[in-house]
Regions:
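Domain-level signature for soluble enzymes in the chorismate/prephenate branch of the shikimate pathway
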Residues: 1-316
Length: 316
């Protein structure tokens, strides 16, 4: 079986590296056909149109936060859902054409997000260069190979792909930087619950005082931990926003399902973007186990309904 996965190209991007990691971890039993595109929006549109089975897109960076083009594209239209996530460590190589004199570098290119992650190095080593933004880091490397710019910051693999010379390796202003990528397909049955999951929703609220507080209270009352909340303009009127929320838990967890059901009653619009296994970095722990404790409490009540009256155990 062959599946097509759209990703921010060309070959050599961190997104491509995430794609192959998904192939290993999430899609091991299929043949993957990569489909390079020019933006996260194009990758998601390829899924909606059926031109791709999945899209691999960056969603959050540990240094710069949310990847807003991805959030906007996820909310732009229905029909897509997240089925997995993975983390990629981010370091850059500085590259140029082999015959080029590094002392004469005048133009420098990379993706705008990447620029922020190598800004200190560039300021120290290339203080006079003009920045030329690229649609991706690998596209910047391609521009160097084609002679349109003098140097680029990109994954080191891009230098091999475009026959460039690496003049500096392992460049990162913040050590330990990493980016979370998600695998997005057409809407369907969510991934099975694992007990360590993430769920995402997008919603709009009526323009009344207290509506956001009320919406978030539905999660707090049920002990559902939010791992991220972002607001993005609806692009219809000034001052109108949609909210993106990630939470720890699965739609099959009773507290999560109850919170989302209550949220539905409060919202003008609510989109469920899926529940999927969380990718934890080494040493990272789930911030609390409230959802698990509430599930334990529900099971305790069910035993009473069956006439099996258990002794209540005090919380640890």
């Amino acid at each position: 079986m062959t599946v097509t996965v759209a990703y921010l190209g060309p070959a050599g991007t961190f997104t491509e590296a995430a794609l192959w990691k998904f192939h290993e971890q999430t899609l091991p039993d299929v043949t993957v056909q990569p489909l390079p595109v020019d933006s996260p929006a194009m990758a998601l549109d390829a899924v909606r149109s059926g031109d791709a089975d999945y899209a691999c897109v960056a969603i959050e960076n540990s240094v710069d936060g949310p990847v807003t083009p991805t959030f906007d594209a996820l909310a732009a239209a229905p029909g897509v859902q997240i089925y997995g996530e993975t983390d990629i460590d981010i370091t850059f190589a500085i590259m140029m054409r082999p015959e080029f004199d590094s002392a004469t570098i005048r133009t420098f290119s990379t993706h705008p997000v990447a620029r922020q992650q190598v800004a200190d190095w560039v300021a120290d080593n290339l203080p006079e260069v003009d920045f030329i933004p690229a649609s991706s880091n690998a596209a910047a490397a391609q521009a160097v190979a084609e002679g349109r710019v003098d140097a680029a910051a990109a994954p080191e693999r891009a230098a091999d792909l475009f026959n460039l010379e690496v003049v500096a390796r392992d460049i990162a202003d913040v050590r330990g930087a990493h980016t979370r990528f998600v695998l997005v397909g057409q809407s369907g049955v969510p991934c099975p619950r694992t007990g360590d999951d993430r769920t995402s929703v997008v919603f709009n609220l009526p323009q009344r005082p207290g509506t956001l507080v009320g919406a978030l209270t539905e999660f707090a009352l049920r002990g559902v931990d939010l791992s991220r909340i972002e607001s993005r303009p609806t692009r219809t009127n000034i001052g109108t926003y949609r909210f993106h929320v990630d939470l720890n838990g699965h739609i099959d967890d009773a507290p999560v399902a109850e919170a989302i059901s209550a949220l539905y009653l409060r919202c003008d619009d609510l989109t469920y973007l899926g529940s999927w296994p969380a990718a934890r970095r080494e040493g990272e722990q789930v911030r609390n186990n409230t959802v698990a404790r509430i599930a334990e409490a529900h099971a305790w009540v069910e035993r009473m309904r069956r006439g099996d009256i258990p002794e209540r155990r005090n919380p640890e």
